[in-house]
């Protein structure tokens, strides 16, 4: 017998002959160790081309850190490139948007592309920005002649650039991240978008602290009038129920003047109670915490059968997500209108892209019919169209252990820092023990 193999028959207390007759025949026959090994379920073997750090996360594979392009692995270990259709969709999505307004065309040019960053997790104490800082130049041309308009003739004080975080293939917005478990671990998160929250089924409750109204089933029925602790004190307004369609009754919480909304299931109330709450019976109402802000938002979990687990939603891209325009000189002493995004960080690791959208929040000079607008304010109080948008190159966000360090300060960053833009500039090599922390503004 193999010394590394011991059967249960040789152990005390496990002699098959001492067992009852029917139990003895019900036991599986113990044969050669090779046959026992062959009867055990075999786990899938790890492909030979898989990096070593995959061994502990097999089945939850992520994109290799040294491969910027998305790829998949076949059973034989060979890597396959994205299909032609996927590449075509990505190329189509990456096409910049050029808008036109008042006889001028607007286009964005990402002169300084982001390259890498270190993930900051869910703490903001040791947050590192994306390096080098993205620098975007706004190019304004005449719609008829196509010539670039002089920057001195452009009033840029109301120009704003917004930034979003997108996936590597530019097909999905990943501005949010959600915990997939009860513990707030950065390794158990999935990216999400605002559109996915808006399409959440009624089983999942609202996101407190926002104007997005999400329906929610109450956790249980209550045969008592619904009264909040604030209403018992008599210091706040009572709750009024107004009908919202044939299926839900909306309950407005008037605490503090903040519009938190919850929804009650129609199964917990009679049809005549949809319009108003009458009688001693009413649905149990759960009011979201009014002091929860946009930074960390909790999705309240439904309790009906089939509801997948919900967790906390928080922003994946943090920092200054918008920037004003500046008239700056580049290293070649050419003046232009620039947007500098020097304070952007990503919570999770992966490969991402940034999408930049330019809007003019100033009051329109012309009406939609083409006539002169009555400018009573310098600020646009209505809707402002996106006049130009574009994507950045793909950049990689590393974990703290794999982060190779911040990029060297570029001549463009040093040039803008000399003109008053707050860009972190690294000191000369040898000036400090840890170059990653030797950043000046």
Curated annotation (Swiss-Prot):
Coiled coil: none
Ranges annotated as biased composition (Polar residues): 1-14, 60-75
Primary localisation category: nucleus
Domain of life of the organism encoding this protein: Eukaryota
Annotated region described as Disordered, given as residue ranges: 1-104
Location in the cell: Nucleus; Cytoplasm
This protein's record includes keyword Cell division: no
Gene Ontology biological process terms, A to Z: sporulation resulting in formation of a cellular spore
Keywords assigned by UniProt, alphabetized: Cytoplasm, Nucleus, Sporulation, Transcription, Transcription regulation
Domain Velvet: 100-426
Subunit structure: Component of the heterotrimeric velvet complex composed of LAEA, VEA and VELB; VEA acting as a bridging protein between LAEA and VELB. Forms a heterodimeric complex with VOSA; the formation of the VELB-VOSA complex is light-dependent.
Family membership noted in the UniProt record: Belongs to the velvet family. VelB subfamily.
Its biological purpose: Component of the velvet transcription factor complex that controls sexual/asexual developmental ratio in response to light, promoting sexual development in the darkness while stimulating asexual sporulation under illumination. The velvet complex acts as a global regulator for secondary metabolite gene expression. Component of the VELB-VOSA heterodimeric complex that plays a dual role in activating genes associated with spore maturation and repressing certain development-associated genes.
Protein name: Velvet complex subunit B
Record organism: Pyricularia oryzae (strain 70-15 / ATCC MYA-4617 / FGSC 8958)
Gene name of the record: VELB
């Amino acid at each position: 017998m193999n010394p590394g193999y011991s059967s249960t028959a040789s152990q005390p207390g496990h002699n098959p002959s001492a067992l009852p007759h029917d139990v003895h025949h019900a036991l599986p026959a113990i044969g050669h160790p090779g046959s026992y090994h062959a009867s055990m379920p075999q786990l899938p073997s790890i492909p030979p081309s898989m990096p070593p750090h995959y061994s502990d996360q097999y089945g939850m594979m992520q994109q290799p850190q040294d491969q910027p392009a998305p790829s998949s692995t076949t059973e034989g270990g060979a890597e396959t490139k994205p299909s032609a259709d996927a590449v075509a969709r990505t190329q189509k999505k990456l096409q910049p948007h050029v808008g036109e307004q008042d006889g001028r065309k607007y286009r964005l040019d990402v002169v300084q592309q982001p390259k890498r960053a270190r993930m900051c997790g869910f703490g903001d104490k040791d947050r590192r920005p994306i390096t080098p800082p993205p620098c975007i130049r706004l190019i304004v041309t005449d719609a008829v002649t196509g010539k670039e308009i002089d920057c001195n003739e452009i009033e840029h004080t109301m120009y704003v650039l917004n930034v979003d975080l997108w996936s590597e293939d530019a097909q999905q917005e990943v501005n949010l991240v959600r915990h997939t478990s009860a513990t707030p671990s950065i390794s158990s998160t999935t990216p999400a978008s605002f559109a996915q929250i808006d399409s959440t089924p009624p089983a999942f409750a609202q996101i407190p602290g926002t104007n997005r109204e999400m329906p929610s089933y109450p956790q249980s029925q209550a045969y008592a009038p619904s009264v909040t602790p604030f209403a018992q004190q008599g210091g706040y307004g009572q709750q009024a129920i107004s009908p919202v369609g044939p299926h839900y009754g909306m309950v407005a919480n008037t605490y503090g003047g903040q519009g938190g909304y919850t929804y009650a299931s129609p199964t917990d109330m009679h049809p005549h109670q949809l319009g108003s709450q009458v009688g001693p019976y009413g649905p149990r109402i759960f009011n979201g915490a009014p002091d929860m802000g946009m930074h960390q938002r909790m999705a309240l979990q439904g309790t009906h059968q089939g509801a997948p687990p919900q967790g906390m939603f928080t922003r994946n891209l943090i920092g200054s997500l918008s920037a004003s325009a500046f008239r700056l000189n580049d290293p070649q002493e050419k003046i232009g209108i620039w947007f500098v995004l020097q304070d952007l960080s990503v919570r999770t690791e992966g490969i991402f892209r940034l999408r930049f959208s330019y809007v003019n929040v100033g009051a329109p000079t012309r009406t939609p019919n083409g006539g002169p607008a009555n400018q009573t304010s310098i600020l646009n109080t209505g809707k402002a169209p996106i006049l130009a948008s574009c994507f950045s190159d793909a950049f990689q966000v590393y974990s703290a252990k794999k982060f190779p360090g911040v990029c060297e300060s570029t001549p463009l960053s040093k040039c803008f820092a000399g003109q008053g833009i707050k860009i972190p500039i690294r000191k000369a090599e040898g000036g400090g023990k840890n170059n990653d922390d030797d950043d000046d503004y």
